[in-house]
C-alpha cells in the first residue's frame, strides 16, 4: 500500500470515529479532487489534503482551487459557496522531519502529522465560512461515486465516454470497410 493510501485510510478511520461521513478522492461539488472529504452532522465539510513530498506540496500552491478558497474567505456568508468549511494538510514525518511546517500555512489551515501509523494534530483548522452544505446531496454523491469506482473501476462519465468512443470506433470501422468495398479494383 502506498504511503498516501495509508495516510488516507488513517484519516478516514479517525473521522469515522468522530461520527463523520468520509470519502477518498472525491471530486464533485468542490474544485479539484479532495484526498479525503469529511462531512459532519452539522453540515460542515472538511478537506484533508495529503502531501507526501515537498514537490507535491509546492505544486499544490499553484492549483486553481485556492481562488475558490480566497473567494470563500472574502464572502463568507455566500450561499453559493463551493468550498469546504475547513482545510487541513496531512503529511508524514520522515526521519524525524515533517514535510510541511506550521509556518508555511495560511492562517485558516490545519496541519496533521502522520508518524509511526498515528495522526498527530499540530494545528486545528479555522472555519473558512459558515455555509452549511446539503448533507443528503453530498452523501448521495459520495455513495454514487464510491459505487461506480467499486463496481466499474471508474466514474460514471468515464465509463460512458469509453462506451461512446468504442461505439464511434465501431461505426468508423464499418464506414471505412463499406467505402473500401465500393472502390474500383485496379
Regions inferred by a protein language model and the residue ranges of each:
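Short, well-structured alpha-helical interface segments that form or flank functional binding sites
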Residues: 6, 31-34, 79-82, 86
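Acidic-basic catalytic patches of nuclease active cores, encompassing PD-(D/E)XK
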Residues: 1-32, 39-41
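Short, flexible, glycine/charge-rich loop motifs used to bind or transfer phosphoryl groups or to couple energy/partner
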Residues: 11, 26-27, 36-38, 75-80, ...
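Flexible, charged surface loops at secondary-structure boundaries
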Residues: 15-17, 39-42, 79-83, 105
Amino acid at each position: 500500500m502506498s504511503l498516501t493510501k495509508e495516510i488516507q485510510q488513517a484519516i478516514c478511520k479517525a473521522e469515522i470515529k468522530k461520527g463523520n461521513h468520509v470519502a477518498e478522492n472525491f471530486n464533485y461539488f468542490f474544485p479539484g479532487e479532495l484526498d479525503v472529504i469529511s462531512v459532519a452532522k452539522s453540515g460542515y465539510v472538511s478537506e484533508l489534503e495529503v502531501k507526501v513530498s515537498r514537490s507535491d506540496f509546492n505544486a499544490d500552491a499553484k492549483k486553481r482551487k485556492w481562488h475558490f478558497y480566497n473567494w470563500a474567505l472574502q464572502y463568507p456568508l455566500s450561499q453559493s459557496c463551493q468550498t469546504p468549511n475547513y482545510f487541513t494538510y496531512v503529511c508524514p514525518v520522515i526521519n524525524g522531519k515533517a514535510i510541511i511546517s506550521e509556518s508555511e500555512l495560511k492562517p485558516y489551515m490545519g496541519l496533521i502529522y502522520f508518524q509511526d501509523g498515528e495522526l498527530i494534530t499540530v494545528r486545528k483548522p479555522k472555519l473558512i465560512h459558515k455555509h452549511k452544505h446539503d448533507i443528503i446531496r453530498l452523501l448521495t454523491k459520495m455513495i454514487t461515486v464510491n459505487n461506480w469506482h467499486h463496481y466499474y473501476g471508474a466514474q460514471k462519465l468515464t465509463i460512458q465516454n469509453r462506451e461512446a468512443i468504442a461505439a464511434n470506433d465501431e461505426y468508423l470501422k464499418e464506414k471505412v470497410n463499406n467505402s473500401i468495398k465500393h472502390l474500383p479494383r485496379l
